[in-house]
């Protein structure tokens, strides 16, 4: 398991991270990947951490067999996706767009699977452009429930991919909209 992230683990991260960090852990302000490695290494062996992934070090992905991606939009994300495409590796990319209107949040969660057989469709769905100045998510707003739901939807999609869950639809792209509680699937087989 390879973890990539250059963020520092601060109080706003604690609300959406597994477990409950101590005040001492928060004061130490470790890298987020080091905090998560400490938790997950109690259950898994072979976890390695890297502070960042971008066009300069995508070779760190050599040898992977699958990837979950939750990367800020930009050229670094494009380089990672091009690398996993070249490796022939399936990925699941998640994203979230939020807006604040009249003091109330609304938004859409996205889960997109890219396999060697659907690269073109997936590339149309994966965003490389950030939310700009209206991007509420970048303000560290606390939406742990939406982060968790997006992660769970990604894991369910992966379990369908490996045959654990039945997948009659074969959807490769799903969105969840908070207003109306709508879960929509697209790009099926």
Task: Name these PLM-found stretches.
Residues 2, 13-23, 53-69:
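Long, low-complexity, intrinsically disordered polar/charged segments
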Residues 165-177:
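Core catalytic loop region at the nicotinamide-binding pocket of NAD(P)H-dependent oxidoreductases
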Residues 2-44:
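Glycine-rich phosphate-binding loop and adjoining beta1-alpha1-beta2 segment
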Residues 44-51, 58-150, 160, 177-189:
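E1/E1-like adenylate-forming module used to activate ubiquitin-like modifiers
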Residues 152-166:
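Oxidoreductase and adenylate-handling cofactor-binding alpha/beta cores
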Residues 30, 34, 145-153:
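Electropositive phosphate-/nucleotide-binding environments in soluble metabolic enzymes
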């Amino acid at each position: 398991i390879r973890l990539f992230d250059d963020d520092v683990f601060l109080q706003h991260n604690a609300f959406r991270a597994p477990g409950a960090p101590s005040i001492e852990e928060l004061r130490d302000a470790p890298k987020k990947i080091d905090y998560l490695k400490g938790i997950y290494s109690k259950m898994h062996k072979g976890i390695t951490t890297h502070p960042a992934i971008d066009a300069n070090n995508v070779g760190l992905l050599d040898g992977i067999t699958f990837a979950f991606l939750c990367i800020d939009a930009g050229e670094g994300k494009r380089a990672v996706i091009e690398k996993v495409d070249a490796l022939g590796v399936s990925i699941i990319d998640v994203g979230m767009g939020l807006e604040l209107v009249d003091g109330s949040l609304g938004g859409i969660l996205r889960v997109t699977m890219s396999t060697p057989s659907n690269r073109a469709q997936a590339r149309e769905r994966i965003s490389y452009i950030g939310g700009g100045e209206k991007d509420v998510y970048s303000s560290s707003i606390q939406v742990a429930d939406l982060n968790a739901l997006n992660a769970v939807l990604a894991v369910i999609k992966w379990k369908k991919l490996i045959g654990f869950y039945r997948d009659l639809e074969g959807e490769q792209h799903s969105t969840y909209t908070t207003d109306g509680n709508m879960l929509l699937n697209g790009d099926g087989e």
